[in-house]
């Protein structure tokens, strides 16, 4: 077992070391620690601890997003495959406002969709997706890999996103969608059954 020092001398000036540091990227720190409540010395010790852990216990953070309306086997398959390729999986669930911006409408309210996804054993953390800016998401969650459906592969939009993420050391992995099932198809079937 490698000992972790209780105290690490803080350099002077502190600003020179923290001007580019946006706070911890390891999920256990980012989720549980309020940076605004830490002193300069505490921030420095947290920084050192994170660098130490990243050296000896590196983790792969995965990220994926979706509406997850009328949760089905296709959603489950994607989350299962994503978790198999990372240590910690963060899932962004689109808000009702974002869904309507895309000229769609979610059957299940956002809060319930988020709770459903949080209950899936492959998911380590659920976050709110309020916009489609993937680089903004990377700045916040510092994921190493993003998982996306392969229907986006090769499009101008995702070619640019891939290039932007590659530039910061992250990659995009495309998964094939489960054939024969989708939230849209399920919703259309329900409308037909109700005679709408």
Describe the predicted segments one by one.
Residues 34-46, 50-196:
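Nucleotidyltransferase catalytic core that binds NTPs
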Residues 1-56:
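Adenosyl-5′-phosphate
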